[in-house]
């Protein structure tokens, strides 16, 4: 009889209660900020980390989970009698974590040549609850008797149409990290310019620029409507960093889409380290990209 584990990392942003409910195994990233090493989901809450970023002098950096750490986790599954592990790490193009997992498979063969653990390593091509939610869906389907091959196909099919729109209310973090120039950030702040950014297939793109904080939410919702027009089984989620604009985004989405979000969730340390601590995100079903 199959015994299946679902393994991911803290970039998934799955709330702890959901992870426990569905039995999702989450490995934590380390985040270095002003010479202090934080273990995501362990050292502090998301809200505390947002505050630390706002007060920091430097830029947070994340360390990839190592092959040794993955090999130890795989060995644990072998010892506990698992037959399969579905491993979905952070987007391959944004971290060496995926390749480290590949290396760990080779290490496992050397350390446990007799093992029969099947490792299904998947690249979600995205971040946060864009894939985290569907890992929970996967876990529920497996519990109800679905085949591994079926849930993997369904997961990959879903990832092929998921998109994110980001609305950062401050350019400070993007300036610090070099994602925009210091001059552009200063001018943007002085003029109240806010970029509207999509994150699709692991790639970011500035889709629009609006002037004034009050224009951010309408622009995000309008862009989502345009990109999801005609999509069957449309759903959406809202990510946030505990800022007042979260409620504005949810209200606007409920009005525009005629339905509540699947989930309103906090952006974790890995994601907010890149977006900044004053950001809202709209995750939604777009058209298949093939």
Language-model segments: residues:
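Anion (oxyanion) recognition and catalysis
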Residues: 20, 79, 113
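N-terminal glycine-rich anion-binding loop in soluble enzyme alpha/beta folds
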Residues: 5-71
């Amino acid at each position: 009889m199959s015994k299946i584990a679902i393994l991911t990392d803290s970039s998934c942003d799955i709330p702890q209660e959901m992870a426990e409910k569905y039995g999702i195994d989450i490995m934590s990233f380390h985040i270095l900020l002003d010479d202090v090493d934080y273990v995501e989901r362990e050292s502090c809450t998301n809200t505390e980390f947002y505050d630390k970023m706002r007060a920091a002098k430097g830029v947070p950096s994340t360390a990839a989970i190592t092959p040794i750490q993955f090999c130890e986790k795989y060995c644990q599954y072998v010892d506990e009698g698992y037959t399969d592990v579905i491993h979905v790490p952070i987007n391959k193009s944004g971290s060496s974590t995926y390749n480290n997992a590949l290396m760990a498979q080779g290490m496992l063969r050397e350390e446990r040549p007799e093992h029969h653990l099947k490792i299904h390593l998947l690249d979600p091509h995205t971040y946060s609850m864009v894939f985290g939610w569907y890992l929970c869906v996967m876990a529920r389907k497996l519990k109800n008797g679905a085949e591994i091959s079926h849930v993997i196909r369904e997961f990959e099919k879903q990832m092929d149409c998921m998109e994110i729109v980001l609305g950062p209310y401050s350019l400070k973090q993007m300036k610090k990290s070099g994602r925009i120039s210091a001059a552009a950030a200063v001018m943007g702040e002085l003029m109240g310019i806010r970029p509207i950014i999509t994150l699709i297939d692991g790639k970011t793109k500035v889709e629009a620029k609006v002037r004034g904080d009050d224009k951010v939410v309408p622009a995000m919702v309008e862009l989502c409507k345009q990109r999801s027009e005609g999509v069957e089984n449309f759903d959406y989620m809202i990510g946030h960093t505990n800022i007042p604009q979260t409620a504005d985004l949810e209200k606007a989405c409920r009005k525009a889409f005629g339905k509540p979000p699947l989930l309103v969730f906090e952006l974790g340390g890995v994601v907010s380290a890149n977006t900044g601590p004053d950001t809202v995100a709209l995750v939604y079903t777009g058209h298949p990209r093939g």
